[in-house]
Curated annotation (Swiss-Prot), chain A:
Gene3D superfamilies, per the entry: 3.40.50.360, NADPH-cytochrome p450 Reductase, Chain A, domain 3, Nucleotide-binding domain of ferredoxin-NADP reductase (FNR) module, Translation factors
Domain FAD-binding FR-type: from-to ranges: 235-485
Catalytic activity: 2 oxidized [2Fe-2S]-[protein] + NADPH = 2 reduced [2Fe-2S]-[protein] + NADP(+) + H(+)
Gene name of the record: tah18
EC numbers on record: 1.18.1.-
Example of a GO cellular component annotation carried by this entry: cytosolic [4Fe-4S] assembly targeting complex
Protein's UniProt name: NADPH-dependent diflavin oxidoreductase 1
EC class (word): oxidoreductase
Binding site for NADP(+): T500, S568, R569, K574, V575, Y576, V577, Q578
GO terms for MF: flavin adenine dinucleotide binding; FMN binding; NADP binding; NADPH-hemoprotein reductase activity; oxidoreductase activity
Start-end of Low complexity biased regions: 1-10
Domain Flavodoxin-like: start-end pairs: 23-167
Pfam family, one: FAD_binding_1
UniProtKB/Swiss-Prot annotation, chain B:
Sequence segments annotated as region (Fe-S binding site B): 273-287
Organism: Emericella nidulans (strain FGSC A4 / ATCC 38163 / CBS 112.46 / NRRL 194 / M139) (Aspergillus nidulans)
Protein name: Fe-S cluster assembly protein dre2
Function in brief: Component of the cytosolic iron-sulfur (Fe-S) protein assembly (CIA) machinery required for the maturation of extramitochondrial Fe-S proteins. Part of an electron transfer chain functioning in an early step of cytosolic Fe-S biogenesis, facilitating the de novo assembly of a [4Fe-4S] cluster on the scaffold complex cfd1-nbp35. Electrons are transferred to dre2 from NADPH via the FAD- and FMN-containing protein tah18.
Domain notes: The C-terminal domain binds 2 Fe-S clusters but is otherwise mostly in an intrinsically disordered conformation. The N-terminal domain has structural similarity with S-adenosyl-L-methionine-dependent methyltransferases, but does not bind S-adenosyl-L-methionine. It is required for correct assembly of the 2 Fe-S clusters.
Length: 654, 310
């Protein structure tokens, strides 16, 4: 691999100052897509002999951007047009008022945004960042790009053409010296971090993980339910104990929905709309099957550690390891690493095919794998992976000549990422009797069929569905996008959340109840100052998936709650939440317009929030039966936009 | 996408905070609460101060009070007037900003018996509620703060300030910050990120524009939120394909609930292309084995409950 000294500039180990040809690729990623984009951009730069660093935004300082030849930002949008959590520290440091307009002069950047056009604030995070970078004097050297999750070819549909253009730009503006060529795609870029066996003797002194037997909870659970403890030193995480894992839909119903209760010993507080993240694990069976396929039986249960491949490189040049704080995992074996960290059930990205093509010598397999990485075969790639939801494990079964060196496991497989779940508890449900925090979740277990015979299962919900109460999990608490103020909680509200979308709304309803109760305690006999709430709920059948029906009864008097329901399969004609809103348009108009109420829309992204938005606009147009002049279409639309601007229309969909 | 070159002004946009509270107890003090748009109309402001004596009158911007940027002196004002315009021209703007946070800041700054009024003498339902919640009493024109001593107003304390009174259940606490959000930067020192984008940005097309049209010869895909029926069509195709595949397998005596064995080395039972055994990545469009794992020629395949067991 003669061309592969690309990134090391081995001849000149001089000071880390601005090297002649360096690239920094930074990302703000919530679900991992922006990180994938960053990694693909990074690989491209490295192949063009840029000394390349890839990092999450929170790990870089704005002041350091200047020292790179080029900086590429890959940023997704979350919440109400916000930057992802792992970019917000950086972002806030850019928002400082005192920064002069020359603060970033000399910084040469481009950017790529990832968004979902079913959100009104499509790609706002990237656009805000772009504007702020310009305000602070940075130079956009290549026009940014934007990907849309709703695009028919997914993110790739816009990313691939953008990347091709950027590559051309780099070659034009930063030509390679005569005699030097880009590293071809079929030459593997050596991984920066590799696994090494640890000295087993010395390592034996490590503390072994605490006994898995915690407070065992008895009860009737299928054998598939296991008691599991989570030992991962995950960033900013809390150890939670699962105290309930209850199926709330009938066994006969097509969908398995779980009502989970988790407790934490610390008195953590949270607000409606906040989100809990859970990082799943792989099953022991899947990992065993991978170990056998790869022929790793000999190393599987030996202690390993993650080390830089090239220990001579200065730490400045060394990108951060693919997994953080792995050192503090108690007695890490290859098997534990596979179970806890590597996403072997992920739907692979194109870069995965490029990586594993290096690990087979069987021409037929190699050729096909490389075809899948070719943008011209995007359709076939999509038909083979995303469309049928084919996992890495299944692909390795099929391409069984691929033998990944175990040392490269962390650079070949994606890292298991955390999944977000809206918290369903609020008010008095937020605390345990002994002063700890309590979290409730409502989770639909993901199972579906594609053209692949074997039923598809969601990695995280499968992990959750088999946990026996008493198990521990590492959870992270994140602030959500609903940001309902106390004023909004006691004010008139319209809550729209079909299916498990009702979770964050339930949190709000219990929060309202707690406000009313505490007011009543202090002012006995006085009518609590609470305005009416309309909950619009939708499901398939009242009998099967009307979650928390009893609670709504219980809460309705306390907080002036009116529940409107739409059960699509309970009558011949399908009825959805938007239909119920339409039927009640004057009620809606009165609550939202006359009373100045706020709307919260939660649930699946895509069609539902769009239909709701449309129906609300219509309600503003036609719902005014007070006889005053009706809104025109334009005015109704403007009114909705106005609500959005003033935080009276909030959407949290997933 | 014209680069908007904005230098950042760090001075408060409209600073007329009480210069000192020396005259706090001499004469009647008035607090004017203005919607931000008034700041652009100097003449309007000048007229105001002909009506209200500058020396006993403070002006605050509603949005700044609402955002908690302003601390008002306690028990100081006899009149708080919301500048809705005498003809109500600024009513909607002003009232929109007259939120709970404003009451929380303003009511303690009012003397006992002080009045809260709007220029056009209008209070909507929402304002009424908030004012009452804040412990004010409705009067003919606006609201009044009860004199302490004769009948105490009961302000609804909804968290926020949790110093006094050991509340039995802390109802609202600041949201937890466990994510990496917690730098030490005060919001005060930051620009408002929402000002970075305008309404035009909302409408800005995606760059580069999406190529939704299918390319010639390429299979068409449905968008994630497909409404045109393509998604359903594709799903139906997939189902059909799966069923067709099931059927072809059954022709070869592979009942899905039977434990059947199939020897792929037997003539006529393997696809003519010879690629079937390699897996979906190599199978052709109508392959009956689509969706089944790869197998070795000669390997026994059992189909148990619709799942191939290799």
């Amino acid at each position: 691999m003669s061309g592969s000294q690309s990134s090391g500039s081995p001849g000149s180990p001089g000071p880390p100052g601005p090297p002649g040809r360096s690239a920094l690729v930074v990302y703000g990623s919530e679900t991992g897509n922006a990180q994938d984009v960053a990694e693909e951009v990074g690989a491209l730069a490295e192949r063009l002999h840029f000394t390349t660093q890839i990092s999450e935004l929170n790990h870089v300082k704005p002041e350091s951007l200047r020292s790179y030849t080029i900086v590429v930002f890959a940023v997704s949008t979350t919440g109400q047009g916000d930057l992802p959590a792992n970019a917000r520290t950086f972002w806030r440091s850019l928002l400082l008022k005192k920064l002069p307009p020359t603060f970033l002069s000399g910084v040469r950047f481009t950017w790529f945004g990832l968004g979902d056009s079913s959100y009104p604030k499509f790609n706002w995070a990237a656009r805000k960042l772009y504007k702020r970078l310009l305000q602070l004097g940075a130079d956009e050297i290549y026009p940014g790009g934007e990907a849309d999750h709703q695009h028919s070819s997914g993110l790739e549909g816009t990313f691939i053409p953008w990347l091709a253009g950027f590559r051309k730009h780099l070659l034009d503006k930063y030509p390679l010296p005569p005699g030097q060529d880009p590293i071809p795609d079929d030459v593997q870029l050596p991984p920066k971090w590799v696994l090494r066996l640890r000295d087993q003797e010395a390592a034996s002194e490590d503390v072994s993980p605490p006994d898995a037997m915690g407070a065992a909870v008895t009860g009737d659970f299928p054998d598939s339910y296991r008691l599991d403890n989570d030992h991962r030193p995950l960033h900013d995480s809390l150890t939670a104990t699962l105290v309930q894992n209850k199926r709330v839909t009938p066994q006969t119903h097509w969908q398995d929905v779980r009502h989970l209760i988790l407790t934490v010993s610390d008195p953590i507080s949270y607000a409606p709309g906040d989100v809990l993240t859970i990082t799943p694990k792989n099953t022991a069976e899947d990992v065993q099957s991978l170990i056998e396929m790869m022929g790793w039986q000999e190393q599987a249960d030996q202690l390993v550690s993650l080390v830089p491949r090239d220990s001579t490189r200065s730490t400045n040049e060394l990108p951060s390891p693919p997994i953080h704080s792995l050192d503090s995992y108690p007695r890490l074996t290859l098997r534990e690493l596979l179970i806890n960290y590597l996403d072997i059930r992920a739907i692979p990205r194109r870069s995965f095919f490029a990586a594993i093509a290096h690990y087979t010598t069987y021409e037929m397999h190699k050729e096909r794998l490389l075809e899948f990485t070719n943008p011209e075969y995007l359709d076939e790639f999509w038909d083979y992976t995303t469309r049928p939801r084919r996992s890495i494990l299944e692909i390795l079964h099929e391409f069984d000549t691929v033998k990944i060196p175990w040392q490269h496991a962390t650079s070949t497989f994606p890292i298991i990422r955390a999944r977000q779940f809206s918290i369903a508890s609020g008010g008095e449900l937020k605390r345990t009797s002994v002063g700890g925090a309590r979290f409730e979740l409502l989770i639909a277990i993901v199972k579906y069929r594609t053209v692949i015979k074997k039923i598809r299962e969601g990695v995280c919900t499968k992990y959750i569905s088999n946990l026996r109460p008493g198990s521990t999990l590492k959870i992270q608490l994140q602030r959500g996008g609903l940001n309902s103020s106390v004023g909004q909680l006691v004010g008139p509200t319209m809550l729209i959340g079909p299916g498990t979308g009702v979770a964050p709304l339930r949190s709000m309803l219990w929060e309202k109840a707690a406000i009313v109760k505490s007011y009543q305690e202090k002012n006995p006999g006085v009518d609590p100052p609470i305005e009416p709430t309309i909950l619009v709920y939708g499901g398939r059948n009242r009998a099967a998936d009307f979650f928390f029906e009893d609670e709504w009864q219980q809460l309705s008097d306390l907080i002036k709650l009116k529940v409107l329901t739409a059960f699509s399969r309970d009558q011949k004609q399908k009825v959805y939440v938007q239909d119920v809103i339409r039927e009640n348009s004057s009620l809606v108009f009165n609550l939202l317009h006359d009373k100045g109420g706020a709307v919260f829309v939660c649930g699946s992204s895509g069609r539902m929030p769009q239909a709701v938005r449309e129906t609300l606009t219509e309600a503003f147009q036609y719902g005014n039966d007070a006889g005053t002049q009706p809104f025109s279409r334009r005015e109704a639309e403007d009114y909705l936009v106005g609500m959005e601007k003033t935080g009276r229309y909030k959407q949290e969909t997933w | 996408m014209a680069p908007s070159f904005v230098s950042i002004d760090t001075t408060p946009d409209f600073d007329m905070t009480p210069t000192s509270s020396k005259s706090a107890d001499s004469g009647k003090r008035t607090l004017l609460l203005a919607p931000p748009s008034i700041a652009t109309q100097e003449d309007k402001l000048r007229t105001l101060f002909t009506t209200y004596d500058r020396s006993t009158t403070d002006l605050q911007m509603l949005d700044r009070v609402s955002a908690g940027f302003v601390s008002l002196p306690a028990n100081t004002y006899d009149l708080v007037l919301v500048l809705t315009g005498t003809d109500g021209t600024r009513r909607s703007e002003a009232l929109q900003l007259l939120k709970r946070e404003v009451y929380a800041a303003v009511v303690p700054a009012m003397k006992g018996g002080a009045k809260l009024q709007t220029e056009d003498n209008f209070f909507g339902e929402a304002e009424d509620r908030e004012a009452v919640l804040a412990g004010l009493v409705k009067k003919e024109t606006g609201f009044e703060k009860m004199d302490v001593g004769n009948g105490a107003a009961v302000p609804l304390r909804l968290g926020r300030k949790k110093k006094a009174a050991p509340a039995p259940a802390p109802v609202v606490q600041p949201p937890p910050i466990i994510s990496s959000d917690d730098n030490d930067l005060n919001d005060d020192e930051l620009i408002d990120e929402d000002t970075l984008l305008s309404a035009d940005d909302l409408k800005r097309p995606i760059v580069p524009p999406p190529e939704c049209q299918p390319k010639a010869g390429k299979r068409r895909r449905a968008c994630k939120d497909c409404t045109c029926g393509l998604a359903a069509q594709i799903e139906a195709e997939d189902r059909e394909r799966r069923e067709a595949a099931d059927k072809s397998l059954n022709v070869m005596k592979l009942e899905s609930d039977d434990l059947n064995e199939l020897d792929f080395t037997v003539q006529g039972k393997t696809g003519s292309c010879g690629n079937c055994a390699l897996g979906d990545a190599f199978r052709c469009d109508g392959c009956p084995f689509i969706g089944l794992p790869a197998f070795k020629p000669g390997q026994e395949v059992q189909i148990l409950n619709d799942v191939a067991q290799l």
